[in-house]
């Protein structure tokens, strides 16, 4: 056990975590240069296309150190985006140490701080690593100063590397072996293993990712999940060496996988403890706090025939994405579907893309919302995350919406535009402080609903990419909210309903009506699109009807003949309008999202 090192790489987005993982894998000779490809641990197409890590990935490396001993290194590459913090915290629970990666030109950013606090919470040994030292804009002395002042770490221990060029990788491996502690655990105690992730294999069932805390396990042994007492027999165990590599067993301190023919997807829960049936441990491992969803949206299959496939796909995706929460939902306009909770808008996009790509299901996604707390006239409280469930306003005493504390780190020359952006989003300026002579941390309290759509994108464009943003949830606060309904041909479409602040309601209604007009195809009759609060219409757009030229066969002659044909056409259209149902395409629901992004 003394030769095992379990560690994660944590950093802000784009500071080079996956590239550093690539170099460590190459330096230890796990993959030959011929078979190597960049971002080797990012095995989803969507990760490669976007150039981001979404899933934490584990890899087992063998390293022969300068002292002549061979060490087992278990590396977990983590995501950097604020939406995937839950992935990071789960990875850290399986480690004793962390490499805190900092870009030599960008310096310490918001997620650097957030990830440092996470690592400190888990009592990890932290090694600061300054990456991208090959860049012309690299300022190593400035970053060392930030490590001392902003992070409170010893900058003398910082390792200088260029993951792209491969500089300093051997020195880093030596520091990992010397500085990081080996895992603690009792090899002779009853088996206690923490599930920190899992994924589904169509041939082998659920593959469980485990960190062995105490004891040992080997194939053919009977195991039990402590949260639900489900029992299975181990078929295979081993390490992740990019692909699965089976081993005759796993020992205390090791990180690996087990396959036990688990076909019931719901039996495997992240944070659960595995023990042996014949000799169980007394107490489970302290797991993870449940991920709290921040953004809610409904997902419906475009074709109702795909509903059963969607149920199956969500179950399997939940295995691999523990922060996804969902429950059954139905809509008069869209049929049966699911109300899902996500950690942010990027998380929503990724889930949508994975469902469509990996499971081949065409989806309709409704506009994302947050959860609101309603205090009714009788004093009772109700929490809703779906605008369609908003009760009659006369029953509501007041409404509360969630607020966040946002930490925004920017160069001070962008202070004015960022302040303006936050004020436009109903922000409250709480504090600001200079981190260095020209870098500023601004603290704002903002309504979550104003942030979930495009706040981060706007911040990045205002600050030309130099702004970074992190947030934590605060409380619910009183707010003047109204339910905005949309009517198409005087029929309410529940899936288009939104809860908005009264001051923004009219502008939002106009924009949405305009977008709907652009995306609903022209019909044989006139279509009215209305935005309304209660019974009061506050915005309207009209889609004109197709008009067939019924007078084409009249050559000259009396005008009354033409008039008669036109009147006849009008009557036919009137009748058609009464029975005509307007088909609302997927594009119209997406249009509501687009409105938010403008």
Where are the regions that the model predicts?
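Structural and coupling elements of P-loop NTPases
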Residues: 1-598
């Amino acid at each position: 056990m003394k030769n095992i090192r379990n560690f994660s790489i944590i950093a802000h987005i784009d500071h080079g975590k996956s590239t550093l993982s690539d170099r460590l894998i190459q330096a230890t000779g796990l993959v030959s240069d011929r078979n190597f490809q960049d971002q080797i641990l990012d095995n989803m197409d969507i990760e490669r296309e976007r150039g981001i890590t979404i899933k934490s990935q584990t890899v087992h490396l063998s390293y022969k150190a300068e002292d002549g001993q061979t060490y087992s290194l278990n590396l977990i590459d983590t995501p950097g985006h604020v939406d995937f913090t839950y992935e990071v915290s789960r990875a850290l629970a399986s480690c004793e140490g962390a490499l805190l990666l900092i870009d030599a030109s960008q310096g310490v950013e918001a997620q650097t701080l957030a990830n440092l606090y996470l690592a400190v919470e888990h009592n990890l040994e932290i090694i600061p690593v300054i990456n991208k030292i090959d860049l012309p804009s690299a300022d190593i002395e400035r970053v060392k100063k930030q490590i001392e002042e902003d992070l409170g770490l010893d900058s003398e221990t910082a390792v200088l590397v260029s993951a792209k060029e491969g500089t300093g990788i051997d020195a880093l491996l030596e520091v990992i072996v010397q500085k990081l502690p080996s895992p603690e655990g009792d090899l002779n105690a009853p088996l206690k293993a923490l599930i920190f992730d899992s994924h589904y294999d169509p041939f082998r069932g659920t593959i469980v990712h485990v960190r062995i805390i105490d004891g040992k396990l080997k194939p053919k042994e009977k195991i039990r999940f402590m949260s639900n007492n489900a029992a299975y027999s181990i078929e295979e165990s081993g390490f992740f060496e990019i692909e699965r590599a089976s081993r005759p067993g796993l020992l205390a301190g090791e990180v690996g996988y087990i396959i036990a023919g688990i076909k019931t997807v719901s039996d495997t829960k992240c944070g659960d403890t595995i023990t042996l049936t014949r000799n169980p441990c007394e107490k489970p491992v302290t797991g993870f706090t449940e991920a709290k969803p921040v953004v809610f949206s409904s997902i419906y299959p475009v074709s109702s025939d795909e509903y059963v496939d969607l149920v199956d796909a969500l179950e399997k995706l939940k295995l691999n994405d523990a922060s996804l929460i969902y429950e059954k939902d139905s809509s008069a306009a869209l049929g049966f579907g699911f109300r899902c909770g996500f950690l942010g808008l990027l998380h929503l996009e990724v889930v949508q893309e994975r469902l469509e790509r990996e499971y081949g299901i065409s989806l309709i996604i409704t506009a994302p919302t947050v959860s609101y707390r309603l205090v009714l006239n009788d004093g009772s409280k109700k929490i809703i995350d779906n605008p369609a469930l908003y009760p009659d306003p006369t029953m509501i005493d007041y409404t509360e919406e969630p607020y966040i504390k946002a930490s925004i780190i920017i160069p001070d020359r962008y202070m004015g535009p960022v302040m303006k952006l936050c004020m436009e989003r109903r922000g409250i300026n709480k504090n600001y402080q200079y981190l260095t002579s020209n870098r500023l941390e601004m603290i704002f309290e903002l309504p979550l609903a104003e942030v979930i759509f495009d706040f981060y994108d706007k911040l990045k464009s205002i600050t030309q990419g130099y702004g970074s943003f992190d947030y934590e949830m605060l409380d619910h606060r009183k707010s003047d909210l109204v339910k905005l309904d949309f009517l198409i041909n005087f029929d309410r479409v529940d899936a288009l309903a939104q809860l908005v602040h009264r001051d923004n309601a009219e502008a939002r209604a106009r924009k949405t009506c305009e977008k709907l007009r652009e995306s609903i195809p022209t019909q044989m009759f006139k279509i009215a699109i209305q935005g309304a609060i209660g019974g009061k219409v506050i915005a309207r757009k009209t889609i004109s009807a197709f008009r067939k030229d019924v007078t084409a066969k009249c050559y000259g002659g009396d005008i009354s003949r033409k008039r008669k044909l036109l009147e006849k056409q009008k009557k036919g259209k009137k009748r058609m309008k009464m029975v005509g149902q307007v088909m609302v395409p997927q594009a119209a629901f997406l249009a509501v999202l687009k409105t938010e992004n403008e």
